[in-house]
Amino acid sequence: RVEDNSSLFGIRGTEDLGGGLKAFFQLESGFRLDSNNSSFATRNSGIGLQGGWGSVLMGRWDMPYKVAGYPADPYVLLTLAGYWSSVQDSGNFGRRPQNVVQYWTPNIGGFTARVAVTANEGKTATVDPKDFSAMIGWARGPIVVNVAYEKHEDQVGSTATAGAEEEGLMGVVSFKFGGTKISGIVERIEKTGRANRENFYVSLVQSIGKHDIIGTAGQTKGGQANGAAGSEPKADAVSIGYRYNFTKRTQMNVLYAKIKNNATSAQNFPLLPVPGVGNGSDPEGVSFGIVHVF
């Protein structure tokens, strides 16, 4: 099976309003060349104001929790092997909700933070679904450290459910020395009616001139329904990739990725699932792509 799931097109712009204030906008869409059935502004799209006090954004945008993991992910959603597309519970904690309001602080001594809340548009007499997400980060030279928290109220995944809660806590570290970058993510997810889920992910990028050799390994375990029979679900994910940087704006990527499930786990590639994957299955895939930024 051949799929095109990571082609993107976007535009952005700013206007100087004077007095240190700027307006900014972005419209970004994912599109599929193989099926031509894409919608408009499905990715980070919004409008906001920016000043010395920080930025305020309204629209559809990645939550701070999701953004916190970017420094450790050498693929950042573009392939089968990224954190959010291999071991993470992306159906719940890789969100890009619509009608979100976010505040981003300015950089203060290397520290930055983001906070986001969503509109509770699905509110009824019995449920009031809404999200809260926040991250704080510190970067100095080759070191990046991020911590993030997110909570979903009255929700199980994208389904409104009275009394249900989902919470996630994530820690991210990335360190670069010379042409080598080593990164890691540790995450714990708690959900009503389920055992805690723990995720681990490490990545290594070795740059030699225009060539990047990339390796990743991750594990997810737990998350089963309370009282479920059998052993604890566990899945291991690995990948090996190569990137050639033609210029600063154009690169080529190729990689191989595989997920190995134990007898009670059915982890799949969340962004591009392989059909028919059940407990104990081991999905795998090859990805090839070209990125050009203009």
Model-predicted regions and their roles:
Residues R1, V76-S90, E166, V186-K191, ...:
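Extracellular/periplasm-exposed beta-strand and loop segments of Gram-negative cell-envelope proteins
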Residues R1-N120, D128-K130, G137-V144:
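Outer membrane beta-barrel
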Residues G10-T14, G48-Q50, Q102-T105, A116, ...:
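Transmembrane beta-barrel domains of outer membrane proteins
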Residues N37, A68-V76, V127, T159, ...:
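Outer-membrane beta-barrel and related beta-rich outer-membrane complex signature
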Residues Q88, N120-E121, G157-T159, E190, ...:
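Extracellular loop and loop/strand-boundary signature of outer-membrane beta-barrel proteins
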Residues V127, D131-N245, Y256-K258:
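Detector for outer-membrane/organellar transmembrane beta-barrel domains
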Residues I240, F246, G278-F294:
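Outer-membrane beta-barrel "beta-signal"
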Residues F246-M252, Y256-N268:
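C-terminal beta-signal and adjacent terminal beta-strands/loops
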